[in-house]
Design a protein with these regions (language model features):
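Hydrophobic, small-residue-rich alpha-helical packing segments that form membrane-like cores
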Residues: 150-152, 156-221, 225-240, 247-273, ...
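M16 family metallopeptidases and their MPP-like homologs
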Residues: 45-55, 81-129, 136-147, 174-199, ...
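Non-catalytic terminal extensions that flank enzyme cores
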Residues: 1-47
Length: 958
């Protein structure tokens, strides 16, 4: 490393971190007081983050709104939305901003040095010199504002964060966690909702926003993170241009520990659908503060204990409550912050039995603590945790960004930055604790002996939505009636100013101020994992040739294409049932412990592939392990696949009920997922398959099954028979990543018998209507329009560029910026499916019109001669993914199942590089033709149903 004490920075500390193969440099910017950490690692992906301590003083969501707003133009970049411009034209591998409970972080990453410097510069200018400080319209757009309709003489509220949080508060899980934190940490920042409570967001004023920014967004309160191979001197020089404008001052202090308190049970209501029965739908959340950020051993210990107590239906605490019919599901997890909380969540209970449940949990944990915990179970779970920690596989999340998010969890409070990344010593200490009573002592922290605990009882109310809608309407009428003429004129003027700012065309100078890339900056080659196809013992082998650091990943894919419709739900249920039933040699808990003790993972799931419009579904049984443990892998795969005894109807009922509840929660909190599957289920087989495996069709079937013991018994028998039917060598394809020998694979193949006859494929019939409204207890909407076109496959490069144009320009401006929705987008899939979608949308009727008009926008853009290079660059960047060994295995397998190759990807890339503006007319034709005979699905509450054209619409009540 060359001398890095340049550009106003001085080195405080240098340390080699062998555990992550990095050298850490801790620096300080002398003049401004900014802190900086650089991890010098062999990673071509360069990561940056800047974070600020932002403890909230109220529930207005001020720091969440600032997080959104600073990215809406700055002193150097005079655009309304540089963030959206970066999404259009950057090669970024990560671009986001995140509000935590006491900090706000702005992370970016890119493999391209030029792009990386551009991103850093835009973000630094955004956080320190945002246009927010001089333009109240930015606050009105991203936070909240009044809207007055003179025709109806009504007043309403709108705003991106306001609508985002209305969606969040529609989720029972989020509402419960927010309420629990308020009870545990009353009177502190951690008892406030940093995201913003929709009831309190309107209390926030523009002056309050400016004051909060001035206080918290100063370099002395900033911590900067860098990671990867980069020209560090250039980065430090760039940072100095922003930091040197400031003089050092005292940073914002984060409050110390909250005084321990035992809070009384807090009772709140949560909304369920009007059609739902309230009986047995209450939820209980218990919270126990057990340590602070300095005690990292306790976090690992609590992860171990949570898994032992509640990791599966066979775990002792969860099994006890299920067997006594006191709940339908249960979870236990840690919520980590300055102080760490163990949360026990008990779902679908009788509200009158809450005290009984609390007492039973307390007694059970005390008994386990006094009798001692089986050391082999602790050791097995620790092995599993250690495997994941050493694997350090974050999926598509860049490693540097994952490190940044981890580091801020302790660094923000004054801990050494590296503390959060290093685990060897911590694991050794935790293992040492097994010799004594460490784990038993930790258990006592989740009993009534804990002096810092709280409980929340959530009562279902199927009238709450209508009641709150009526109250909100009355409240807005009252506010309007109380306004003077001058106040109303001010509201109208603010809205007019907002619309004028939103619709103003950026100047040429403003557009040219934003740093851009050219097509020459795009890497000429792509690195996409591709499976090599071999045949072994009559079975197809998919080998993914990437380095795995001694880990072997194997997936066994059993073709289930001779099943369709309702039968596919049984495949999905089977994947959930495996590992929850006894086998020839093990109880469920013993099998799980064997897997944890010897493997990295052992799992069952479902997979699908689509070739030329024909869908193939699979039961997937997989495992990962060190090369030295592959004998155990073979042994446990055999045990799971061939000897599982699925014959316990009570356990099948538990699983069916839990899956039903999970789907119900998903339909409320992630309504766009449901809307997309419903819209596509009326158009293509893939949509129908998705519905039966995990959508509304699955939910509807499970509701019917769970109401009848006879149907549960039939389901149990069907699933048991299905396992025997599917685990057949004729159906098998094996995906392998890592140094697995043919001998090992032959051994796996030999496990499975080979039946006779051909596997006759069945087609799954379409299962949705062309125009649907799914009624859920949600205060915001999710609106989708889908269509099909066989021209997409031959124009995939064009449609990928159009996705960028529509998602980050047209839809962003019309649905997010003007409409106030939290999210929106357009997607075109290789099978020909096209979809528009909105997310946490206050006006789905308007969004549907925007979708229809998109083709006119594309034709107009095609005739304008506008340079669309930035959209090409952004589109290519989206598909140049970062690959870890586990991700490589998944991607290469998925590509094969879908008939996609590295050559296909390279061809599409070449097509994208040659797209011109005039080609957009062709895209408009494809979209116009598809959606003219397409389908519409909207998921929301009653108030939005009233705003839609109901002609020909099917209304589904959840």
């Amino acid at each position: 490393m060359t001398n890095i004490e340049k550009h106003g920075f001085s080195v405080i500390r240098e340390q080699r971190l062998d555990e992550i193969d990095a050298t850490m440099y801790e620096l300080c910017h002398t003049k401004s007081g900014a802190s900086l950490v650089y991890l010098e690692r062999e990673d071509e992906n360069k990561s940056f983050a800047i974070g600020f301590a932002t403890p909230p003083e109220d529930d207005t969501g001020v720091f969440h709104i600032i997080e959104h707003s600073v990215l809406c133009g700055s002193e150097k970049y005079q655009l309304n939305d540089p963030f959206a411009e970066l999404l259009k034209g950057s090669l970024n591998t990560f671009l986001n901003a995140i509000t935590y409970e006491d900090r706000t972080i702005y992370p970016v990453s890119s493999r391209c040095e030029k792009d990386f410097l551009n991103l850093v510069d835009v973000y630094m200018d955004a956080v320190f010199a945002p246009n927010l400080l001089k333009n109240p319209s930015i606050f009105h757009q991203e936070g909240w504002h009044y809207e007055y309709d003179p025709e109806s003489d009504t007043l309403s509220r709108n705003g991106v964060v306001y609508n985002e949080m209305k969606g969040a508060y529609s989720s029972a899980d989020e509402l419960g966690m927010i309420t629990l934190n308020r009870a545990l940490f009353e009177g502190t920042a951690y008892g406030k909702d940093s995201g913003g409570d929709p009831a309190y967001i309107p209390n926030l004023t523009y002056d309050m926003v400016k004051a909060a920014h001035e206080k918290h967004y100063h370099p002395s309160n900033a911590r900067i993170f860098l990671d990867g191979i980069m020209d560090l001197e250039s980065v430090l020089e760039l940072l100095d241009t922003h930091l040197s404008k400031y003089d050092r001052r005292e940073p914002v202090s984060l409050a110390g520990k909250c005084a321990p308190r035992v809070a009384p049970i807090k009772r709140i209501s949560y909304e369920i659908a009007e059609s739902e029965d309230e009986k047995g739908r209450a939820r209980l959340m218990l919270g126990y503060v057990y340590s602070d950020y300095t005690d990292r051993e306790s976090n690992i210990a609590m992860s171990v204990l949570s898994d032992i107590l509640c990791g599966s239906n066979a775990s002792p605490l969860k099994k006890l409550l299920l067997d006594k019919n006191l709940c339908k599901d249960m979870a236990m997890y840690s919520s980590k912050s300055r102080e760490n909380t163990l949360v026990i969540e008990v779902r679908d209970i009788d509200e009158n039995k809450a005290d009984e449940i609390i007492n039973l949990i307390d007694d059970t944990i005390r008994t386990m603590a006094s009798e001692g915990i089986d050391k082999s179970k602790i050791n097995a779970t620790l092995n599993s945790i250690e495997f994941r920690l050493r694997e350090r596989d974050f999926g598509t999340l860049p490693t540097g960004i994952a490190f940044a998010m981890t580091i801020y969890g302790g660094w923000i409070y004054g801990a050494n930055p590296e503390d959060s990344l290093l685990y060897n010593d911590i694991l050794a200490k935790v293992r040492e604790g097994m010799r004594g009573s460490y784990f038993e002592d930790m258990l006592m922290k989740i009993t009534r002996d804990n002096p810092h605990r709280a409980a929340v009882l959530m009562i279902p109310d199927n009238k709450l939505g209508a009641k709150e809608a009526t109250e909100d309407k009355a409240r807005m009428a009252e506010i309007l009636a109380g306004m003077s003429k001058e106040e109303l004129a001010s509201v109208v003027a603010d809205e007019e100013a907002l619309r004028a700012w939103q619709q103003a065309e950026p100047t040429k100078e403003a557009m040219e101020s934003l740093p851009t890339l050219s097509l020459d900056d795009i890497p000429k080659t792509i690195s996409r994992p591709c499976a090599k196809v071999e045949m072994l013992c009559g079975v197809k082998i998919l080998r993914c040739p990437v380095k795995t650091n001694g880990i072997v990943y194997i997936s066994l894919l059993f073709d289930t294409s001779d099943l369709s419709g309702e039968e596919l739900l049984r495949v999905s249920m089977l994947s959930s049932a495996l590992l929850n039933f006894p086998t020839e040699s093990y109880s469920p808990l013993e099998l799980q412990n064997e897997a944890k003790a010897n493997l990295g993972s052992l799992f069952a799931s479902i997979a699908t592939g689509s070739r030329d419009g024909v869908i193939t579904t699979y039961l997937k049984i997989g495992a990962s392990a060190l090369l030295s443990k592959t004998d155990d892998m073979v042994r446990l795969i055999r045990e799971l696949a061939l000897t599982s005894r699925i014959d316990d109807t009570a356990e099948i009922k538990n699983l069916a009920t839990q899956i039903k509840t999970h789907l119900e929660d998903m339909m409320i909190s992630s309504g766009e997922t449901l809307a997309l599957s419903r819209a596509q289920a009326s158009l293509n087989e893939e949509g129908a398959v998705t519905e039966y495996m995990g959508g509304y069709e699955a939910y509807k079937l499970l509701c019917d099954i769970c109401d009848s013991d006879e149907r549960i018994a039939a389901l149990t028998a069907d699933i048991s028979a299905l396992l025997k039917k599917l685990t057949d060598r004729r159906r098998l394809t094996i995906s392998v990543t890592g140094d697995a020998s043919d001998e090992l694979l032959s051994e796996i193949i030999s496990i499975f018998p080979s039946g006779e006859g051909d596997i006759i494929k069945k087609r799954t019939a379409l299962c949705a209507d062309k125009k649907e409204f799914v009624l859920t207890p949600s205060k915001v909407a999710y609106a989708v329009v889908s269509g099909m076109s066989d021209r997409v496959k031959d124009n995939l490069g064009l449609m990928r560029v159009v996705r960028s144009i529509l998602s980050y320009e047209y839809l962003w401006n019309n649905i997010r910026v003007l409409g106030g929705a939290y999210g929106c987008g357009f997607v075109a899939k290789r099978d020909g499916a096209l979809s528009f979608y909105s997310y946490r949308d206050p006006n789905p009727a308007a969004s549907l019109k925007v979708y229809t008009a998109s083709v006119d926008y594309l034709r107009e853009l095609a005739g304008s001669g506008e340079d669309i290079t930035k959209f090409i660059i952004g589109s290519i960047g989206e598909h140049d993914m970062l690959i870890t060994p586990r991700t490589a295995s998944l991607v290469s397998t998925t590509d094969y199942l879908n008939g996609w190759s590295a050559e296909d990807e390279a061809r599409v890339r070449r097509e994208m590089l040659g797209i011109k503006a005039e080609d957009l007319c062709r895209a408009a034709e494809i979209i116009d033709s598809a959606i003219s005979c397409g389908s519409t699905a909207v998921v929301s509450g009653q108030e939005h149903l009233a705003t839609l054209d109901r002609d020909g619409m099917t209304v589904i009540k959840i």
